[in-house]
Curated annotation (Swiss-Prot):
Coiled coil: none annotated. It comes from the Bacteria. It comes from Roseobacter denitrificans (strain ATCC 33942 / OCh 114). This is UPF0178 protein RD1_0321. InterPro entries: UPF0178. Belongs to the UPF0178 family. Pfam families: DUF188 (PF02639).
Amino acid sequence: MTALYIDADACPVKSEAERVATRHRVKMYIVSNGGLRPSQNPLVETVIVPDGPDVADMWIADRCGTGDVVVTGDIPLAAKCIEAGALVLKHNGEALTSANIGNVLASRDLMADLRAADPFRQGGGKSFGKADRSRFLDGLERTLRKAATLG
């Protein structure tokens, strides 16, 4: 049976994911190391993991599998989940797959190296807007339908 795993650290689409999961009657796990208000929705389980590097990521990676959906902005976690057979979405609705995760990992590493080489470089990512939420909702809807055929 399909499950939806949310890497909740800095996730801007938790409430949107909950709405879609509820509509599909899919169990949803919101995984974090704390600071979240638990949902009253019986389909949503808030999982609080101990503090530590990548503990939430490991919890998700250890449990997800074929037919599950993972929402994360963490590219190494996405790679592990894809390897386990899960379908993965970024917060903006972009699907990460076995076909594109290698390039995404390489780009991530390159950008980390560039930032390390120039610590005075200012700037950040673009803000998360209404269009991003809309793309996420559409992407999650399609991905959950696809997952239902796999799991």
